Curated annotation (Swiss-Prot):
Its EC number is 2.5.1.32. It comes from Zea mays. The gene is PSY1. Pathway: Carotenoid biosynthesis; phytoene biosynthesis; all-trans-phytoene from geranylgeranyl diphosphate: step 1/1. Its main location: plastid. GO terms for molecular function: 15-cis-phytoene synthase activity; geranylgeranyl diphosphate synthase activity; squalene synthase [NAD(P)H] activity. PANTHER family: BIFUNCTIONAL LYCOPENE CYCLASE/PHYTOENE SYNTHASE (PTHR31480). This is Phytoene synthase 1, chloroplastic. Keywords: Carotenoid biosynthesis, Chloroplast, Isoprene biosynthesis, Plastid, Transferase, Transit peptide.
């Protein structure tokens, strides 16, 4: 499921330190410190239904069909991403039939104590920047816990390329080099100790490179794009930068042996959590992004609400803005609802951190409402007290049977 990836600069944690604008690789600062069988599962927006609720039309808050300038129907972003989900699910099922979890990349030669140090450093970074999620990972088996740390760190380093302190120096060429480095670590040739942790993880779990490549593509998008014409475009961006994390994580989290859900439905729910988290980031950071000249809101929906870019830059909360935000929050919550069912299908030891992520991120939407939809000058956040209260709730939910069993699915 999706790891929390906050789209904001974090001082002292920059992957750009390892890819300079001249293109030379340098040492990273991080090193120093079920449904009935007859029904095919598809994303709720493609079915035109409220998440997990048959027979009831949803509000038009998802896009499922795009139209080109000639007026011809084209494949929507959701369908493109769903095709990726199907491929990832098929790959997982195929690789689990022929497990290679004890294999190591042929070219990788690193002492065992070196790998331990690499994983420990990943854990330190996760603890520093995602404390609640880190706490939840401590309930996982050691192998899964370390693997999730390694994935988290790679995602964070990638995110820092365009959001970190050196973001102004990052070019498309630098991202191409980062992708080449990704390909190297997937073939057992890591550049540094943090890469080595992920390379070892890849050798132990059936993880595919495609979601990692797609995340880098999202960073490329951030370099060239500051507006999104409609939700179809925004959905693809959210998939690239956050939905991919869910697809990376499912093979590590594992699916409960007693689950009756299809593999593709679990992947799709993981994707939904990533999308929900990113939409929440966007709604929380409207003012901050506007000050950087960026608007991550569907332009057509702004226009329909009688709003423009100028209204965003002025940052005045009006009734039009409140009504617009209510609709955006409703859509984000629908993705959270879609994600909830998939969390229950994960291996029990993996559920707590995912539930914690889901519950805490969803509360950010509540805080935006509590701030009277002022996300221009107020940054919604969940206080420490509410975080502490959410942890036992998340733990309790992690003990429940998979929804596919409770609902009698086969």
């Amino acid at each position: 499921m999706a790891i929390i990836l906050v789209r904001a600069a974090s001082p002292g944690l920059s992957a750009a330190d390892s890819i300079s604008h001249q293109g030379t690789l340098q040492c990273s600062t991080l090193l120093k410190t079920k449904r009935p069988a007859a029904r095919r599962w598809m994303p709720c927006s493609l079915l035109g239904l409220h998440p997990w609720e048959a027979g009831r039309p949803s509000p038009a808050v998802y896009s499922s069909l795009a139209v080109n300038p000639a007026g011809e129907a084209v494949v929507s972003s959701e369908q493109k991403v769903y095709d990726v989900v199907l491929k990832q699910a098929a790959l997982l099922k195929r690789q689990l039939r022929t497990p290679v979890l004890d294999a190591r990349p042929q070219d990788m030669d690193m002492p065992r104590n070196g790998l331990k140090e690499a994983y420990d450093r990943c854990g330190e970074i996760c603890e520093e920047y995602a404390k609640t999620f880190y706490l939840g990972t401590m309930l996982m088996t050691e192998e899964r816990r370390r693997a999730i740390w390694a994935i988290y760190v790679w995602c964070r380093r990638t995110d820092e390329l365009v959001d970190g302190p050196n973001a102004n120096y990052i070019t498309p060429t630098a991202l191409d080099r980062w992708e080449k480095r990704l390909e190297d670590l997937f073939t057992g040739r890591p550049y540094d100790m943090l890469d080595a942790a992920l390379s070892d993880t890849i050798s132990r779990f059936p993880i595919d490179i495609q979601p990692f490549r797609d995340m880098i593509e999202g960073m490329r998008s951030d370099l060239r794009k500051t507006r999104y014409n409609n939700f179809d475009e925004l959905y693809m961006y959210c998939y690239y930068v956050a939905g991919t994390v869910g697809l990376m994580s499912v093979p590590v989290m594992g699916i409960a042996t007693e689950s009756k859900a299809t593999t593709e439905s679990v992947y799709s729910a993981a994707l939904a959590l990533g999308i929900a988290n990113q939409l929440t980031n966007i709604l929380r950071d409207v003012g901050e992004d506007a000050r950087r000249g960026r608007i991550y809101l569907p332009q057509d929906e702004l226009a329909q609400a009688g709003l423009s870019d100028e209204d965003i830059f002025k940052g005045v909360v009006t009734n039009r803005w409140r009504n617009f935000m209510k609709r955006q929050i409703k859509r984000a919550r629908m993705f959270f609802e879609e994600a909830e069912r998939g969390v229950t299908e994960l291996s029990q030891a993996s559920r707590w951190p995912v539930w914690a992520s889901l519950l805490l991120y969803r509360q950010i939407l509540d805080e935006i409402e509590a701030n009277d939809y002022n996300n221009f000058t107020k940054r919604a956040y969940v206080g420490k007290g509410k975080k502490l209260l959410a942890l036992p709730v998340a733990y309790g939910k992690s003990l429940l049977l998979p929804c596919s069993l409770r609902n009698g699915q086969t």
